[in-house]
Amino acid sequence: MSLSIEKQIELLLAGHPLEIGDMHDSTHAVQDEIGGKGTPSTYIPICQKTVTYIVAAVVINNQGEVLMMQEAKATCSGKWYLPAGRVEPNENLLDAVKREVLEETGLTLDPETLILVECATGSWFRFVFTGKITGGKLKTLEEANEESLQACWVNNVNDLSLRSHDIISLIERGKTYVTNKNIPQHPYLMPISIPLSKLLLRLTITSKKRSTNKLHVLVSDTMPFHLPICEINPHRNLLSTLHNFMKELFGNGVAQHKPHGILSLEFSGGQGGDGLCLTLLVSFKLPVEDVPATGKFIWHELPENLATSITSRLPRNMTVPLNVIR
């Protein structure tokens, strides 16, 4: 029996996977509806071959210091960087980030939440976590190996010779999430393990009805009911996939809309494929009456409790940021 849209959204917000049967059916339904334009249908994500998954950890101690490691690789030996590295085949994201932190710093990490997802083209993803150190011993120069030379807690990373300054924004994001308790932040979000063989983008698109002020979401108009979902084009950046998909859903003159961030992340980790599914929250300022859907999708009114839950995730920092690297 297929799940109601309300139940699907509740599961996503609570960090639970949707049934694989529902996802498989809805994926194919959408591909039929929009023709899968712009997406090579023969593409299969294979970890470290046709898709690259990176994990990184921004760990901040009680003194506000950031955990850093010194590179051992010949191309950047002596430079400093966050604990980070490639996800290995058949490895899930949590195991990957724990492994990288242990190998490069000597410390044991208990990941608590995703704080940022980055994407460069549709087949390179970096997942940034934060968490707590629960054990281990900080790596010293005497323990240097091919993974790293040493690790240390750093108060000001700008005092270091960095491998790349691309981590500065990651560290700033981590500090905002961990140390600035005055700013409301999204709840903890962890990857959900589910077999997937494609790179997928699911949209939770909202708008309010002018006549009732009730929140609506866009859903399929036939069973099994589902949120819009499409394949991510591996050769273009993710915003291109989003833009093209929104045009398919609302026509070429799609009204101004705002992508807020990630509500959920489903990741296969080699179990039934090397795919993923990002659920992105998108909102229209214009009312439902002014943004009619095309094709086989309709606006669906949400009950008050669920509308409140979705609305609470619309402000800044209330979803996991998605950074598309151009």
What are these regions (language model features)?
Residues 72, 202-223:
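Eukaryote-biased recognition of intrinsically disordered, low-complexity regulatory segments
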Residues 75-79, 223-226:
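A conserved beta-turn-beta hairpin within the catalytic core of GNAT-like acetyltransferases
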